[in-house]
């Protein structure tokens, strides 16, 4: 009688260490970013077809440590504030630790090292600016010919959020409505969404030809963009607030400031009409200046023009721009006039057309009195406009009868209304002939006789009757037998042609099985 086989120990399963760092790494999907596993043998081939329950699990924590070890050779290429990466890691001072925690946490550090490994950037060597939501650093890249290219790397803070009012700019954003609720409840997801928002806004501005940093690469909370500054020494362009324009005469200086004011209004209009965006935080601190050109930066909080807060943000931008240029001695337009210029959908969006429109606004406005009382009245009008309720949808117009009695120029929402003349249907005979003549006479004034007005009304009613005559309803059930048969044969023929390009079922099964093995 053969003895019974001795029981064998079950295969060792290496469980990943359940730490907070492991959970964060799995949530951020770091493995998929740095190891694609393309061309590696499948698990079934390596283990001889073992079942899923017997296969050892991957120790993700150990794999990430190995990747950090491989990428550590690039640590010397990151120099922030004249400190090497090793000094930042080893120094235990509270200030250095706070800087490392806010910006260069483990995940952000790994993303930057991976960018260096992929030659997206070659070195980070200095700080351009620091803010409440992100820091911007100097970076260097090299093209295929070995030419040095200056870049800017914007790293959004992830741990200590100095800017906590992001919900106001994200809520109601149609581009992110499917994920904004989850992002608002998780700070790390909100940072990722915030960086993606600015990257997409920069793409819109750059495509529309508005001077701004060129967006190049985005990974989680690290964005690489074009550098706006001197490429020889790495100094960025100055902000508009720090710019000093000095001409040979006082008139030349005032003319240059006025030209910049007109250019900025044109950029705001193009940003609204072409890009469909409102900056939301436009001021002299978010505008760079170099050789007569203005550059728009920091568009992370920009919203679309149909956002629930877009009107308030636009009025705030107009107030900041007018106040700044007024302090520089520019004769600015009123806030109400600038608002109508930006939101008018019928005007031109090219440079020459917008410049002519602004010159026309200056020419047609009422003359300004030099007295203090007149200036005070204009300031009161600006304050009223800044605090006035402007409906964004027609559902918010409550007293319609009162609004219809107002003049067209006093309606703040006039740009949302259609033209007063509704295009009539083609083929109507009332457009030409006696009906058209009587209608035109009725529009000229009160000089026409009552008989002519009545005839015009009769012709108009006849035209409306032709336009609203009864037509056959839609739907297959209202078709006759021949039309139904023709439609049925056309549908069959379309399906027959579609089946010719259909993938065979056995080929589809093989592809599905192959994809499962790769996973």
Swiss-Prot record:
Its EC number is 2.7.11.1, 3.6.1.-. GO terms for biological process: ribosome biogenesis. Residues 21-36, 439-464 have a biased composition (Acidic residues). Residues 1-54, 418-519 are annotated as: Disordered. ATP binds at residues 154, 228. Residues 440-519 are annotated as: Association with (pre-)40S ribosomal particle. It holds the Pfam family RIO1. Belongs to the protein kinase superfamily. RIO-type Ser/Thr kinase family. This is Serine/threonine-protein kinase RIO1.
């Amino acid at each position: 009688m053969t003895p019974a086989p001795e029981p064998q120990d079950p295969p060792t399963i290496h469980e990943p260490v359940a730490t907070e760092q492991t959970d964060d790494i799995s949530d951020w999907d770091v493995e998929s970013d740095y190891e694609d596993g393309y061309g590696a043998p499948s698990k079934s081939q390596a283990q001889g077809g073992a079942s899923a329950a017997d296969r050892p699990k991957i120790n993700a924590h150990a794999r990430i440590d190995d990747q950090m070890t491989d990428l550590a050779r690039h640590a010397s290429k990151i120099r922030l504030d004249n400190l090497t990466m090793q000094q930042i890691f080893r120094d235990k001072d509270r200030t250095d630790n706070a800087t490392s925690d806010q910006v260069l946490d483990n995940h952000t550090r790994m993303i930057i090292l991976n960018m260096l490994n992929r030659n997206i950037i070659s070195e980070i060597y200095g700080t351009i600016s620091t803010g409440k939501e992100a820091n911007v650093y100097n970076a260097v890249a090299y093209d295929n010919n070995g030419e040095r290219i200056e870049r800017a790397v914007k790293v959004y803070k992830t741990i200590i959020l100095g800017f906590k009012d992001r919900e106001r700019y994200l809520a109601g954003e149609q581009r992110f409505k499917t994920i904004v609720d989850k992002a608002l409840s998780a700070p790390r997801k909100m940072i990722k969404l915030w960086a993606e928002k600015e990257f997409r806004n920069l793409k819109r501005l750059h495509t529309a030809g508005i001077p701004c940093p060129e967006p190049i690469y985005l990974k989680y909370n690290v964005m690489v963009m074009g550098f706006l500054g001197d490429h020889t020494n790495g100094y960025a362009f100055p902000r508009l607030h720090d710019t000093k324009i000095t001409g040979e005469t006082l008139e030349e200086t005032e003319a240059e400031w006025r030209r910049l004011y007109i250019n900025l209004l044109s950029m705001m209009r193009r940003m609204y009409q072409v890009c469909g965006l409102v900056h939301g935080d436009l001021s002299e601190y978010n505008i760079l200046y170099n050789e007569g050109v203005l550059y728009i930066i920091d568009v992370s909080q920009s919203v679309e023009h149909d956002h629930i807060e877009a009107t308030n943000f636009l009025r705030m931008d107009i107030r900041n721009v007018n106040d700044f240029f007024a302090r520089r001695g520019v004769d600015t337009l009123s806030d109400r006039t600038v608002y109508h210029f930006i939101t008018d959908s019928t005007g031109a969006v090219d440079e020459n057309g917008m410049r002519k429109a602004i010159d026309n606004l200056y020419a047609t406005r009422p003359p300004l009195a030099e007295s203090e009382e007149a200036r005070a009245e204009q300031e009161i009008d600006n304050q009223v406009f800044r605090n006035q309720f402007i409906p964004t949808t027609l559902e918010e117009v409550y007293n319609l009868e009162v609004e219809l009695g107002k003049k067209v120029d006093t309606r703040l929402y006039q740009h949302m209304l259609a033209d007063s003349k509704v295009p009539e249907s083609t083929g109507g005979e009332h457009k030409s002939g006696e009906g058209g003549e009587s209608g035109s006479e009725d529009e000229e004034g009160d000089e026409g006789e009552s008989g002519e007005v009545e005839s015009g009304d009769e012709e108009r009613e006849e035209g409306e009757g032709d336009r609203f005559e009864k037509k056959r309803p839609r739907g297959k059930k209202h078709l006759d037998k021949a039309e139904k048969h023709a439609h049925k044969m056309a549908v069959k023929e379309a399906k027959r042609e579609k089946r010719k390009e259909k993938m065979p079922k056995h080929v589809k099964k093989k592809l599905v099985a192959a994809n499962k093995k790769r996973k």
